[in-house]
Amino acid sequence: VKTVAISQRVDAYPDRGEVRDALDQKLANLISMAGFLPLPVPNEIAMCKRSDAKELSGLKVWLSEIKPNVILLSGGNNVGDCKPRDATETGLCEFAELNRLPVLGICRGMQMMGVLDGGTMTSVEGHVLSQHKLSGEIVGTVNSYHDYSLAECPKSYRPLAFSEDGELEAMRHCQLPWEGWMWHPEREDEFQARDIDRMRELFKS
């Protein structure tokens, strides 16, 4: 079974003195239903140096030991709001590029992929708690939960889908098996065959 390393959102609880990594259980369920093994990635290890690993960060040590087959950048948090998470996802993308692993970015995950490629973010209206009809290579109706979008398709990617108001909703890397989706496939009442089939195709590439 192929393993999928999944980045996690960061939630702070100052009254308890805790900062927690969090992952929607439905996302792990979706990955399992698609036939893969989900492996959540701890965020703070990206900021730590292992005393027994010289210059390697804790994330690099984790990746070298776990050896995931696929990287998934999940939703939640805004890009730039949480340094440990940004560092984790930057390291995951570097590892994926070096090893030519498939990457799927969901919502914030797609935004992070775009920003790492030199893209910029812009605020949008009407994209929170709404539905959009897609046009392009991917069609259908999808959910929407984001306040920001990529201002344009990053240079290393090609667009796969747009919303009715012209915002980029999906993209594919021109050289690597990487895709970004702005919708949340895990938040559907029933998982969509379209999303599961596309996930399987991407993860097996």
Regions found by a protein language model. Give the residues of each.
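Catalytic His-Asp charge-relay segment
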Residues: 177-181
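DNA-recognition element of transcription regulators
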Residues: 144-148
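N-terminal beta1-alpha1 cap of cysteine-dependent amidohydrolase-like domains
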Residues: 1-108, 115-116, 122, 127-135, ...
